A protein has these predicted regions:
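Ubiquitin-like/PB1-type beta-grasp interaction modules and other compact soluble beta-rich domains
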Residues: 1-89
């Protein structure tokens, strides 16, 4: 199982946990597994077509998955995903 580091804004959706584990062969599978186990995360992670929301950044072992293979990026059991929602303000 891969480890997912949960940002503070999403922690209420996962019972306050800083990290959770999820199964999957690639980033998309792992995030969908997270959303299945914690349904309140689905709308924050995914758009209506199942794509990653554009304001959500996901890193696999410190590499932005958007410059890798996106949701199709392979994930190993010892890998760590970090979810970082983009911040905006003024």
């Amino acid at each position: 199982m891969a480890t997912i580091r949960i940002p503070p804004v999403l922690r209420p959706s996962v019972g306050g946990e800083r990290e959770v584990s999820a199964d999957g062969a690639n980033v998309g599978d792992v995030l969908r597994s997270l959303a299945e186990n914690h349904p309140d995360t689905r709308g924050q992670l995914f758009g209506p077509e199942g794509e990653l929301n554009r304001y959500v950044n996901v890193y696999l072992n410190d590499e932005d998955v958007r410059v890798l293979d996106g949701l199709d990026t392979p994930v190993g059991e010892s890998d760590t995903l970090v979810i970082l929602p983009a911040m905006a303000g003024g």
